[in-house]
Every structure is written in structure tokens, then in C-alpha cells.
UniProtKB/Swiss-Prot annotation:
Name of the protein described by the UniProt record: Uncharacterized Nudix hydrolase NudL
Keyword Hydrolase among UniProt keywords: yes
One annotated GO molecular function: coenzyme A diphosphatase activity
Enzyme Commission number(s): 3.6.1.-
Positions that bind Mg(2+): 80, 84
Amino acid sequence: MISLSDFVNRFQLQLPPPPKRLSDNNRHAAVLLPIICKPKPTLLLTRRSATLRSHAGQVAFPGGVADPKDKSIIATALREAEEEVNIPHQKVQVLGQLAPLNSSGGYLVTPIVGLLPPGLSLHSNPAEVAKIFEVPLSEALSLSSYHYLDVSRRGQQHRVYFYWYQQHLIWGLTATIIHQLAQQVQV
């Protein structure tokens, strides 16, 4: 099990890996990786609403597309987290960010890592989020939990990570982001 202080120290001492084959588009998005500061820290995830046009019913971090009014990509992640699951932006202690990743939808997604105090009154925006749940941070960061498939998409090979947590299949970009974080802190 990793303690919160060990996680923070490892995260802040390691540079994120260099980005891989980033797209040249201007479609930017951000997600918040909310780590809840409990005695046994947890990582907050959501199950997207079944009525959404894209990625319906999938497990995801709170986040979304950058708005022209956002002052930074961090502001995008914080705004989206507040809209989707009622995380007050002033309650998030931003630790930093991981290397941006290309999404299958053509966005350049920047993962923002932030700490949350325990006991926040979170509730989902039902138009976007069907469920909020937490995964023990030590389990999410265990590299041995991950499996992967190598798939070909648009003529390029992609590694798709996945793992199960209880009844939740965590896969695709979300699992790739967690896997990237796990590699960075090497639990």
C-alpha cells in the first residue's frame, strides 16, 4: 500500500515521460485525476451516462473539452470536474500534470493530478455522469493489475490497457492514464 505522502513525493520527484506521437490539432481537453486524501487514499472515477453520444456508460475521469474562456488547461479540468461531480475548484490542490495523450476522438487530453480533502459532498450531474465511485489508490497504481491488447486503428498499432475493479471495467484512455501515473510513481 502506498501512503499519500509517498505518492506525492514520488509524483513530484519524477518527470512525466515524453509525449508519444501527439496530434497537430487544436482540439484540447483535460481530465482531473482526483485523489481523495483518506488514511488509505482513493482515486475518484465516474461511469458516464448511458445517454451520452460518445463513450456512453464507460468509466472515465471527470473532464472534457477546453472552453475558450478557460485560462489554462488546468482550469478546464477543474471546471469540468465541478460541472460533472460537484468538486469545488478551490478545494483541489493541483500537484501537476501527466504527459498529454491523444484520444480516439481526436482530442489532445492533458491529465491533471489533484488532491481532494475527504468528506466533500459530491453528486453527479445526471446528464453526464451515472455513477461516482472510488478505487483504492494502491490498487489503481499496481502495474500487475493491468492487461492490454495491441490493436490496429487507422493503420497504426495502439496498446489498449484494461483492468477490472469490482464490477467496473476500466479501459482505454482512462486505464492508459492510470497506467502512465503508475509507471511514473513506480509502486
